[in-house]
């Protein structure tokens, strides 16, 4: 844990993975091998824990859940139990970011937490045209019911935490949160080893590839002008760096 103004932060690794060449359409295999040095890209599914000076506990994203995710076990090992979490901020609503919100019977894992999602994201998943992934999203929205809150970009979601537009990865707006001393970014960076030197590299998960490329370039410029470290949902452990 490190000091973070009126909060401290902790990365919780929900799952560890390695990304294959086939996940990067359009990238020359020779360049992929050169940049990776071994044919696979280390990746991670991360959750970030923030604790404010007033004792309120905030999670940013919730990992995979189920057998694929280790978030709950690791949180409990550090003394943080689901019922003690006050707020959950979602970068977006893909399965590896919301799966941990649901128990095996579709119940809400976090019994008290308010869940914050951007208004464009909420509207996208509500319209019933989002395909199979929409089923899981609607289960989450149903399980948390009146505890779901929406926000718009540029707003202060919670005191000291602002939501910034990082449109591109999805057709809605995958985004980032800025705290007093940290930038928390969603899926603009799946594979740091490739996408930092080559922001034009996309994965099969980028629903809007051209938008994702533009968003990455904008984010790199923004991050380069900021003294704050970057925390990434898919950056390799420890998930925070410059």
Regions found by a protein language model. Give the residues of each.
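Cap/insert and terminal regions of metallo-dependent hydrolase folds
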Residues: 179-242
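Conserved beta-strand hairpin/beta-sheet module of binuclear metal-dependent hydrolase folds
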Residues: 9-77, 175-188
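Active-site metal-binding motif and surrounding structural segment of the metallo-beta-lactamase
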Residues: 68-116
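Active-site glycine- and acidic-residue-rich loops that bind
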Residues: 162-175
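Active-site neighborhood of phospho(di)ester-bond hydrolases with catalytic His/Asp-centered motifs
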Residues: 59-62, 86-94, 116-118, 165-168, ...
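Metallo-beta-lactamase
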Residues: 109-165, 211-218, 224-227
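Short, well-ordered secondary-structure micro-motifs
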Residues: 22, 101, 126-129, 161, ...
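Short, small-residue-biased leader/transition segments that mark boundaries at the very start
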Residues: 2-8
């Amino acid at each position: 844990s490190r000091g973070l103004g009126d909060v401290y932060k902790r990365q919780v690794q929900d799952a560890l993975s390695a990304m294959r060449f086939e996940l990067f359409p359009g990238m020359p295999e020779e360049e992929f091998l050169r940049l990776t040095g071994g044919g696979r890209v280390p990746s991670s599914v991360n959750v970030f824990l923030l604790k404010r000076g007033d004792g309120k506990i905030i999670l940013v994203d919730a990992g995979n859940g189920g057998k694929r995710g280790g978030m709950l076990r690791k949180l409990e090992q550090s003394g943080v139990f689901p019922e003690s979490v006050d707020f959950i901020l979602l970068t977006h609503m893909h399965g590896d970011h919301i799966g941990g919100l649901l128990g095996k019977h579709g119940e809400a894992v976090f019994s008290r937490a308010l869940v914050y999602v951007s208004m464009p994201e909420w509207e996208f998943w509500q319209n019933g045209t989002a395909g199979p992934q929409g089923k899981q999203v609607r289960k989450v929205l149903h399980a948390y019911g009146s505890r779901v809150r929406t926000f718009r970009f540029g707003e202060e979601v919670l005191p000291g935490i602002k939501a910034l537009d990082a449109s591109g990865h999805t057709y809605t707006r995958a985004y980032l949160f800025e705290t007093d001393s940290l930038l928390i970014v969603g899926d603009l960076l799946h594979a740091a080893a490739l996408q930092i030197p080559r922001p034009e590299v996309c994965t099969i998960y980028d629903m809007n590839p051209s938008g994702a490329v533009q968003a990455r370039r904008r984010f790199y410029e923004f991050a380069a002008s900021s003294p704050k470290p970057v925390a990434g949902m898919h950056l390799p452990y420890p998930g925070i760096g410059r």
